Amino acid sequence: WHEQWGGLPSEEFLTTLDPLLAGFRSRLFEKTETADKPVGKLSPEWAERLGLTTEVVVAGGAFDCHMGAVGAGVTPHTFVRVIGTSTCDVMVATYEEIGHKLIKGICGQVDGSVIPGMVGLEAGQSGFGDIYAWFKRVLEFPLKEIVGKSDLLDEEMKERLVAEACNRIIPALTAEAEKIPAEESTVIATDWMNGRRTPDANQLLKGTITGLTLGSTAPRIF
């Protein structure tokens, strides 16, 4: 959406991308609102479910990381890193600073999405916490397959042992990885396991881990 072309891309543009998009534009919205604008109040059903009143004001939606930046107190010339399953690096700039420039390499440049009346700028990586979760699942496999199916323990003991071991994987890796001097680390990774958000977003890219030797350990890979 951009006001320079009257909102959403034209029907011609969309059908050039894919003929199946014919007629799609006419069924979409025509107007956008920033998240500071109230759109209504809480319905009786949700007020009851949440234990709130129907006087609670409901605002429009926005990107989670953009709202995270608002919560962190983002202002012009400050940089906020919102870290979770992925990472989002968020800044805001005035219209005068941005002008008609399109900032290259970043994944988002949105008028009013972070702070109304300013341009929100977003970069980051598509995988962060998700990568830790993936590596944990890799290391969990033998625990669940071998210990979890062992005949040496009863079912309750197997479940408790597997659960305890799985829960301790990330803390144990963290403690050992902290002991490794940065100059001794020969393992290099491109963290694109979920594609690349910045620079130049490409969600089809894959991650790599290089520099592995027979001496590479789980903490060093971590």
Question: Which residues fall in each region the model found?
Answer:
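Active-site core segments that coordinate phosphate-bearing ligands/cofactors
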Residues: 1-23, 33-222
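Thiamine diphosphate
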Residues: 29
